Amino acid sequence: MGCGDIAADLEGGGPWPLGGRRFEGVVVTNYLHRPLLPRLVDSLAPGGVLIYETFARGNERFGRPSNPAFLLAPGELLEAVRGRLQIVAYEHGVVARPKPAVVQRLCAAAGDGLFDITSR
């Protein structure tokens, strides 16, 4: 158990800096590089949890990011993990804090059985 730092260019096309390592949890906030989504799922240990939140279409009205390349389409996070992870929770909508934005939030678990949310 523990935490560490890894400095890596995740968008440069180089080798995946985490190799074959598996993690109990992967957390992503305010970041979207679509080619990484399958690798993030692959990085989960059995029973591991992915928590992902980033901006979605509609955020243009609140400011940046406003480029469609950096905004999730409706249901895009769900589709990215469908058939690979068990969905624990999903939200898509407007948040007021820390500043108004349109976001998608996903919590999903690796495994083929029911996810026991009381044991975490």
Labelled PLM ranges:
Residues E11, P15-G25:
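A short acidic, Gly/Pro-enriched loop at the edge of an enzyme's catalytic core
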Residues E60-G75, A96-R97:
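Acceptor-substrate binding/catalytic loop of class I
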Residues Y31-A45:
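A short, conserved alpha-helix within the catalytic core of class I
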Residues G47-E60:
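Conserved beta-strand signature within the Rossmann-like core of class I S-adenosyl-L-methionine
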Residues H92-R120:
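Core SAM-dependent methyltransferase catalytic element
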Residues P68-R84, V88-E91:
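Short alpha-helix
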Residues A7, V28:
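Conserved residues in the N-terminal Rossmann fold of short-chain dehydrogenase/reductase
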